[in-house]
Every structure is written in C-alpha cells, then in structure tokens.
C-alpha cells in the first residue's frame, strides 16, 4: 500500500509539472489592428543578383566620413551605395580567392554575417584610419581557433578580420589581405556568428569609443546541448567587447578593455572578452541615440522571441530561461515562477512563436531606435520585427515595458492605401520580377544618415526606405 502511495504522489507531481509546460505562454495575441502605424516606403536601391538568385542582404550601415551606405551579401560581396540610392558599386568581395577567406555560405544561416567600419575610418592619422571589420563563416579551419566549443561536429570556423584601405574614399577596396583578429570553431552548422558593431553614441574620449561589440551565438543544434551560454569560460552565447587596435588578448591580436565586467575579476575561468552572456542567437543589436541604451533582438528556441536591454555583465538567461520563462525543452517552457531569478536580465518585450500573425518559424530581428522627426509616426519608438513573416513591430522607447507582448504593436507598409507586411510587398515584387512569390521575408533593418530606416530582405534584392505617410489608426 505504501508503494501505491509513493506511485500516486510521483504521478501527481509529474502531472503537475507537465501542466505547467506550454508552447504558448502568452494568452492574448498581438493585436492585428490596435495601435497600428502605417508608413510609406520607397524602393531606394536594388542590389545585384548572384547566379540569378536575389542578394542575401544581412546588414546596411552608414559610413558618414565618406558619405556612403554599405550593404553586404552573405555570399561575400560588400557594396557601397550613394546616399541617393542611384549607384550601387561592389566595394569588395571577401570571397575572392585573393583574400583566402573562403566564405562558407552553403546554408541559409551561414556566410558573411556582419561588418563594421571603425569610427576613425576616415580620420587621417588616427589608429582606426581606413580600418573596417568583417565577421564571417569560413570553410578554412586554419590557423588553429582561439575559441573551441569542446564538442560538436567542428563544421567550420567563424572569423573576425580587419581590413585596411589605403584610401577610405576610393570606390573599391585598395588595401592588402586582411589581418585575422580571432577565430571561433563552430560545433554545428547554425547559430554561429551574429552582428558586430561600434557604439555610435560614443565620442572620441569616451570609454566606449572604438570598442567593437561581437555577437556570438550558442553554437547551434538546439537547446544549447553543450551548455555553453551560461559557461563564462566559453565564447558561445556571448556578446564580446574588444579593442581591435589593442594587443593584450591571449593571441596578441586585439585588446581587452579594462572595464569589461570580467577583465579584472582574478578568475582564470572567465573570459575577459565577455560583455554579456546567456544569449542564444544575437543577430541584431542597436543603441538608443538619446540615452545610449543598448538593445538586442535575440532569437528564441521554439517558444519565445526576445527584445532585451544589454548592460555590462548582464546574464540574459539562455539556456536556463527562454524569455521570461524557464526553459524546459525544445517543445515547451514552464509557466511556474516567471522572471523568478533576480540575477537574470529579462526581456523588455517578447512574443510567442505561436502568435497568429506569424509563421511557425519565427525569429526576432531588427533593430532601430527611432529618435528622428522625419517620420513623425515613428518618433520615440524601438523598431524590431519578425524575420520570416516580415512583420515590423514597435514598443515605446520611453517608459519601456517589463516583458510580455501586450505593449507590442505593428507597423504596416502603405501600398496605395493598403497596409501590408514586408512579405506581402516582396511577393508582389517577385511577381513583377518573374520570380515565384517568396514564402518568407528574411527581414533585416538598416540605418542611414539622420536616422533613416531601411528594410532589407533576401528575396527580391530591393532595399526599401521608410518615409512618412501620416497614415495611422
């Protein structure tokens, strides 16, 4: 009889735990109509196809010193674009055999991930003069990596390279082969690199000026099987912060800022490069030009997509937490004790992958904090979105929410008076181009001068610029 009681208690406990697991933790969906902002757009520029396939655009950024925008294709090209969008020029192809990079772009997530121009790129005589950086997946696995996962399949490496142009204003890159700063051995073929970038709100003399932030995903597979994101002795699932012009790293190829959170903790088991940890796939981050807040769009596993604030030493929770909820498995999170660990930085906003607005394969993307008055409808908003569905979302930049999706609202594109998602606009363009309509958008954001907001994708080669239409409801 005692055995029966033990069995009954065990079954009840298991049933209770199971009842707390869910794949849809948000009972109320994002409103399809309330608070919708409708903005107009123009087809700003067209990036060339490669072998008949649309450009796989990942990032667009402004290089104000030379008065050009730059955009990359994941297969290797880096293009410059005049501010009027009329001239698109291949500045560099990092996959050209002369450079020895050998870009690994065989899958949708792999390739030339990101790039960043040093803030002194156009400042003659400065340490960063002519320098820019690329973060790319490479077939080459030599030299030996600086960071290894300690498991997995060793599929390829992700490499940070420094390029030095002799003349920053030249139409094409005129420098020598790049210098390698760091190399990461990847355990799996997904969730590898992320974005790299300099803080645009930092000025010369500020502690953060000229320091490069590097997003490194958890290594892939699913659920962080090697438990790397919470391991402070691992590069995976982290945001690094380095001085690319320094030399006090272990390999001597870059510097480690003294004010990094683990740089002077006296612990040999923490990496001094780490700025924040507990991230899954940090593809997009951006800074608020008004107050310097750093935001991150972090892609969730199968349940929750996240928009978070990032601060020095922050633990964003993965793989113990997915959003505000304890991570159980790839099929569910726990509803028990949400946001229950005071040591974790939880999202300011998050949304569920089961939301009716979305496709099943959701992924948070972004990111732009809009503080301009050129598009009054978007003033003081944090803009982000969902990669596959092409949904553009916003939350208020002032008075940020404290998690959940209740504060999330939509931005639609004004197409002859009709509000449409980016995917719908792409599909119409595909028909015009003679292509089959895309099944997903692969949305990314880009930033231009004076707070311009661009929408990128991998499906039609068109860069779209948002403009005011004064249409909202």
Which residues are covered by each model-predicted region?
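Extended hydrophobic/aromatic segments used for targeting, binding, or gating
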Residues: 82, 250-252, 308-309, 315-331, ...
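Acidic, Gly/Ser/Thr-rich repeat motifs that build Ca2+-stabilized beta-propeller blades
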Residues: 20-223, 284-286, 292-300, 360-399, ...
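Extracellular protease catalytic domains of secreted zymogens
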Residues: 294-301, 309-375, 379, 385-387, ...
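Predominantly five- to eight-bladed beta-propeller fold
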Residues: 151-161, 227-247, 308-330, 472
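Repeat-solenoid scaffold signature
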Residues: 268-308
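N-terminal signal peptide c-region/cleavage motif recognized by signal peptidases
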Residues: 14-16
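Blade-edge beta-strand/turn elements of extracellular beta-propeller
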Residues: 28-52, 86-106, 163-187, 208, ...
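Sec-dependent signal peptide recognition
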Residues: 2-10
């Amino acid at each position: 009889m005692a055995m029966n009681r033990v069995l009954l208690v065990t079954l009840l406990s298991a049933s209770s735990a199971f009842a707390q697991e869910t794949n849809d933790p948000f009972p109320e969906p994002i409103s399809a109509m309330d608070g919708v902002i409708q903005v107009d757009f123009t087809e700003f520029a067209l990036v060339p196809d490669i072998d008949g396939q649309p450009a796989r655009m990942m990032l667009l950024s402004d290089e104000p010193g030379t008065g050009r925008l730059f955009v990359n294709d994941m297969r290797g090209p880096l293009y410059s674009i005049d501010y009027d969008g009329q001239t698109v020029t291949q500045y560099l192809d990092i996959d050209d055999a002369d450079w020895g990079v050998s870009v690994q772009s065989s899958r949708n997530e792999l390739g030339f991930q990101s790039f960043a121009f040093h803030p002194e790129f156009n400042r003659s005589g400065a340490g960063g003069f002519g320098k820019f950086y690329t973060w790319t997946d490479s077939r080459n696995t030599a030299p030996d990596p600086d960071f290894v996962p300690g498991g997995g399949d060793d599929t390829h490496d992700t490499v940070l390279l420094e390029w030095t142009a002799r003349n920053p204003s030249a139409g094409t890159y005129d420098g020598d082969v790049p210098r390698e700063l760091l190399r990461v051995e990847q355990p799996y073929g997904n969730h590898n690199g992320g974005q790299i970038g300099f803080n645009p709100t930092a000025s010369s003399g500020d502690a953060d000026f000229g320091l490069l932030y590097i997003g490194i995903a958890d290594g892939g597979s699913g659920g962080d099987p090697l438990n790397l994101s919470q391991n402070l002795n691992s590069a995976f699932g982290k945001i690094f912060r380095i001085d690319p012009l320094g030399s006090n790293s272990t390999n001597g190829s870059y510097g480690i800022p003294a004010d990094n959170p683990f740089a002077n903790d006296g612990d040999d088991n923490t990496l001094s490069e780490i700025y924040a940890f507990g991230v899954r796939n940090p593809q997009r981050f951006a800074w608020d030009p008004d107050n310097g807040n750093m935001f991150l769009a972090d892609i969730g596993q199968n349940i929750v997509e996240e928009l978070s604030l990032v601060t020095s030493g922050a633990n964003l929770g993965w793989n113990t937490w997915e959003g505000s909820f304890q991570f159980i498995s790839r099929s569910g999170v726990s509803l028990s004790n949400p946001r229950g660990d005071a040591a974790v930085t939880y999202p300011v906003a998050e949304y569920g992958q089961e939301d009716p607005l979305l496709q099943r394969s959701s992924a948070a993307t972004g990111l732009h904090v809009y503080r301009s008055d050129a598009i009054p409808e978007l003033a003081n908003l944090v803009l982000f979105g969902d990669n596959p569905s092409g949904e553009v979302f916003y939350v208020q930049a002032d008075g940020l929410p404290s998690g959940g999706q209740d504060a999330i609202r939509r931005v639609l594109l004004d197409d002859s008076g009709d509000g449409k998602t980016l995917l719908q606009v792409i599909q119409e363009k595909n028909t015009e181009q003679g292509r089959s309509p895309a099944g997903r958008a692969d949305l990314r954001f880009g930033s231009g001068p004076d707070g311009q907001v661009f929408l990128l994708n991998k499906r039609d080669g068109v860069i779209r610029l948002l403009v005011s239409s004064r249409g909202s409801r």
